[in-house]
């Protein structure tokens, strides 16, 4: 059984990155093959940010971004990049775990996020869905 973990770990947010890390480690301890689904609504720029988000803060937060990217690279098993819902049909696991950071966020900026983070992309697949 292979499990895909879906959350917003690509945001440079401590809670989201640690949630992905903790769920992945727990599944590892249970002997369950898993990886974090690296879904984003649009391709990240060279700094690991969604283009045009917080431009004024980018210069002052480069070290923070670098540290998040290093942590993800060294401590998370990530799938290949899936960018936008046009690639969502390619995502295939036996089970999906949805992180609480995606369930409880009050903001949905893109329809792509709702499509992904409410399991719309896999509703017709026989996989188990856990949130």
Where are these regions (language model features)?
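Aromatic- and Gly/Pro-rich donor/ligand-binding loops
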Residues: 5-14, 18-131
């Amino acid at each position: 059984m292979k499990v895909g973990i879906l959350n917003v770990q690509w945001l440079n947010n401590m809670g989201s990155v640690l949630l992905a890390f903790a769920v992945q480690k727990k599944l590892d301890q249970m002997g369950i093959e898993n990886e974090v689904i690296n879904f984003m609504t649009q391709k990240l720029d060279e700094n690991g940010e969604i283009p045009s988000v917080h431009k004024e803060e980018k210069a002052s937060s480069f070290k923070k971004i670098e540290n998040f990217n290093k942590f993800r690279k060294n401590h998370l098993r990530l799938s290949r990049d899936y960018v936008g819902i046009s690639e969502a049909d390619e995502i295939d696991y036996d089970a999906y775990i949805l992180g609480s950071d995606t369930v409880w966020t009050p903001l949905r900026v893109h329809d792509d996020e709702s499509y992904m983070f409410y399991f719309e992309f896999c509703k017709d697949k026989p996989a188990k869905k856990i949130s």
